[in-house]
């Protein structure tokens, strides 16, 4: 699993993205992931866009990553790889991003979200992922590691992590961090807690916290936090409603605004907020939002 996160030679997903006919949606099934109308809908919509539009979307994403290094005063030239995380259906955009990252001197690392309980973190998915066939199932099994989580397991996993990072230290040292494509618009899901599901005991919760803290420190020693960066961009999926194409196009417009112009506006807001003790947020018209943030 450590190697998957830093080695561009493990190119299962990259090969699908670069060498498939993306106009033929059957490529989606090559991943072995669940494919729903969200994945096919996004792919169909992106296929309706011109290459210029796709390149512009990808450029916003890749430039955001590059600018993260610049604004953080970090040297991107030290890095040779970037981790792309995305939802199936966005392959046209990801393909353009892969090529643009190459122009920056970065190879792409793309791995599947964790499947085994040893590597999963609750029901959250990091990596490339398809649809979720049964959200309740994912929720029910979010703490299956309660089956085996004990002090000995924590020690073994941390030792294995350390050994793996030692083996792939050179690859980890030149890894730049994640570039994430998130989605929104999913229908609300209210999980039901079931007594049959495995759940952490209080002692296991402390063990999991210890494991998270220690594994984070190990990762930071090899993929140095002060040298890496990230970017996140988000797009809607068809589940958002019948206005999906229009909403998607409007999000593209927002994402492709001149960042230099709005960077100045954002910095002005940040500088002003730095002088405040609290901020009061009130809704307009029928919006009843009333928040006080300290």
Sequence positions of predicted segments:
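Active-site bordering "gate/hinge" segments
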Residues: 1-294
């Amino acid at each position: 699993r450590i190697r998957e996160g830093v080695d561009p030679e493990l190119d299962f997903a990259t090969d699908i993205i670069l060498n498939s006919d993306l106009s033929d949606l059957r490529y989606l099934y090559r991943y072995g992931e669940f494919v729903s109308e969200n994945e096919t809908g996004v792919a169909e919509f992106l296929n309706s866009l011109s290459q210029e539009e796709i390149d512009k979307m990808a450029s916003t994403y890749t430039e955001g990553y590059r600018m993260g290094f610049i604004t953080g005063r970090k040297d991107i030239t030290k890095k040779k790889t970037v981790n792309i995380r995305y939802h199936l259906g966005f392959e046209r955009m990801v393909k353009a991003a892969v090529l643009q990252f190459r122009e920056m001197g970065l190879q792409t690392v793309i791995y599947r979200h964790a499947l085994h309980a040893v590597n999963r973190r609750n029901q959250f998915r990091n990596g490339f992922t398809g649809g979720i066939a049964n959200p309740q199932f994912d929720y029910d099994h979010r703490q299956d590691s309660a089956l085996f989580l004990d002090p000995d397991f924590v020690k073994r996993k941390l030792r294995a992590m350390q050994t793996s990072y030692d083996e792939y230290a050179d690859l980890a040292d030149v890894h730049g961090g994640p570039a994430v494509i998130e989605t929104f618009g999913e229908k609300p899901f209210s999980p039901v807690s079931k007594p049959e599901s495995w759940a952490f005991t209080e002692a296991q919760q402390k063990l999991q916290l210890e494991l998270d803290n220690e594994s984070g420190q190990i990762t930071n020693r090899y993929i140095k936090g002060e040298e890496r960066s990230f970017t996140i961009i988000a797009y809607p999926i068809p589940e958002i409603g019948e206005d999906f194409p229009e909403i998607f196009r409007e999000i593209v417009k927002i994402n492709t605004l001149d960042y230099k112009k709005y960077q100045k506006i954002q910095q002005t807001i940040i500088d002003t907020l730095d002088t405040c003790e609290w901020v009061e947020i009130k809704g307009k018209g029928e919006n009843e939002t009333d928040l006080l943030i300290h």
